[in-house]
């Protein structure tokens, strides 16, 4: 029962997230030979104010 967690910054559309879940499921199923119904994809959308790189928040760039 594979679990895939994807963290990304806010701003993606519902259609983009739907496509991501579908395509990641396909790739994991193919490579691990796991049934699609056993694959869990967790999307963790982060606010730009809650994420920083090099000491700078993404919201401040």
UniProtKB/Swiss-Prot annotation:
Q: Which key words are in the record? A: Isomerase
Please tell me whether the keyword Isomerase is annotated for this protein. Answer: yes
GO molecular function terms listed in the Swiss-Prot or TrEMBL record: isomerase activity
> What positions does UniProt annotate as the active site of this protein?
2 (proton acceptor)
UniProt keyword annotation of Isomerase present: yes
Q: What is its EC number?
A: 5.3.2.-
**A Pfam match:** Tautomerase
Where is the chain membrane-spanning?
Answer: none
Report the sequence similarity comment from the record.
Answer: Belongs to the 4-oxalocrotonate tautomerase family.
Q: Under what name is this protein listed?
A: Probable tautomerase lin2709
Source organism (scientific name) = Listeria innocua serovar 6a (strain ATCC BAA-680 / CLIP 11262)
